[in-house]
Amino acid sequence: GHFILTNRLLPLMQTKNNGRIVHVSSRSGYGQAPAVGIDFDNLRGEKSFDAGQAYGRSKLANALFSLELAQRLQGTGLSSNAIHPGLVQTNIARTAPVLMRSAFEWFGGVIAKSPAQGAATQLYVATSPQLEGVSGAYFEDCNPVVISGQNHMTDSAMAKKLWATAQSMCGQYLT
């Protein structure tokens, strides 16, 4: 996954002292994730599973990974940021129940971004000279967004715990 790939590429990136890592997160990271944030006692959904919360939790995990990586990259010339691409015209709902899929396709066709529009923020964060040295931020529509309220998107303690858990789970693949 993201954790292994990024950690395997970091040594190469660090030889250049310049580079940007952009993580695709989502508003779902704070809108759909359960109130507990990352449920470390139910990571694989073995106790209970809700598809919407699982999606939100995965996007929260991407944002937390980006946040912790930004801390670890301080002073290296590398940066880590997370983005929300917006609602993009994709086939993400292809396996949803028929009613939900139909609603998503209709609603998405009316207000969703094209794939090119959905990629704009990711490309901006990856390439804009204006963002040189910016790390640990979250972007929507090519703008930094400050996340506030009752959520875990900026929970550095949870980000550290998630990193440690991922290291423990993936350790054999990191060397």
Go through each PLM region and give its residues.
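Rossmann-fold NAD(P)H-dependent dehydrogenase/reductase core
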Residues: G1-A96, M169-T175
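Short, well-ordered loop/turn and helix-capping segments at boundaries between secondary-structure elements
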Residues: G19, V98, S128-L131
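A short C-terminal helix-loop "cap" of Rossmann-like NAD(P)-dependent dehydrogenase/epimerase domains
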Residues: L43-E46, L99-F107
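Conserved short-loop catalytic and cofactor-binding motifs
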Residues: Q53, W106, Q150
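C-terminal helical subdomain
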Residues: S58, A82, E105-I147, S156-K161
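Short, contiguous clusters of charged residues that form electrostatic/catalytic patches at enzyme active sites
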Residues: L64, A120, A164
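C-terminal amphipathic/interface module of NAD(P)-dependent oxidoreductases
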Residues: N151-T175
